[in-house]
C-alpha cells in the first residue's frame, strides 16, 4: 500500500461558499423601507424609483410599497418601488 496520496487527490477538493445571489423580492410583493430586493454582481438590474444601490450592487427599497420590474429600454431591466399598487 502506498504511504503517499496520489498527486491529483491532494491538489483537488476546494470549492467556494455560495454567495446567495438573486432576486429576494418579486414583482407585486409588498416591501418595507430597507428591504433587500436583489443581490447581484454588477448591475444586471438597475435601480429605478425609490430604490437604492449598495456598494456591492445590492438593490434595496427606500420606501414602503410594492415592487415593480420594468424595462427602461430594449435590454436594460430596472426595479422600482411604488407606494400604491399600479
Swiss-Prot record:
<dbReference type="InterPro" id="IPR001684">
    <property type="entry name" value="Ribosomal_bL27"/>
</dbReference>
<dbReference type="GO" id="GO:0009507">
    <property type="term" value="C:chloroplast"/>
</dbReference>
<dbReference type="GO" id="GO:0022625">
    <property type="term" value="C:cytosolic large ribosomal subunit"/>
</dbReference>
<dbReference type="InterPro" id="IPR018261">
    <property type="entry name" value="Ribosomal_bL27_CS"/>
</dbReference>
<dbReference type="Pfam" id="PF01016">
    <property type="entry name" value="Ribosomal_L27"/>
</dbReference>
<protein>
    <recommendedName>
        <fullName>Large ribosomal subunit protein bL27c</fullName>
    </recommendedName>
</protein>
<feature type="region of interest" description="Disordered">
    <location>
        <begin position="1"/>
        <end position="27"/>
    </location>
</feature>
<dbReference type="GO" id="GO:0006412">
    <property type="term" value="P:translation"/>
</dbReference>
<keyword id="KW-0687">Ribonucleoprotein</keyword>
<dbReference type="GO" id="GO:0003735">
    <property type="term" value="F:structural constituent of ribosome"/>
</dbReference>
<keyword id="KW-0150">Chloroplast</keyword>
<keyword id="KW-0689">Ribosomal protein</keyword>
<keyword id="KW-0934">Plastid</keyword>
<comment type="similarity">
    <text>Belongs to the bacterial ribosomal protein bL27 family.</text>
</comment>
Amino acid at each position: 500500500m502506498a504511504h503517499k496520496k496520489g498527486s491529483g487527490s491532494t491538489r483537488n477538493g476546494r470549492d467556494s461558499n455560495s454567495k446567495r445571489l438573486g432576486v429576494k423580492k418579486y414583482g407585486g410583493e409588498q416591501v418595507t423601507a430597507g428591504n433587500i430586493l436583489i443581490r447581484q454582481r454588477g448591475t444586471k438590474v438597475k435601480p429605478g424609483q425609490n430604490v437604492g444601490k449598495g456598494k456591492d450592487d445590492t438593490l434595496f427599497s427606500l420606501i414602503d410599497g410594492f415592487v415593480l420590474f420594468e424595462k427602461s429600454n430594449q435590454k436594460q431591466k430596472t426595479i422600482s418601488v411604488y407606494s400604491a399598487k399600479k
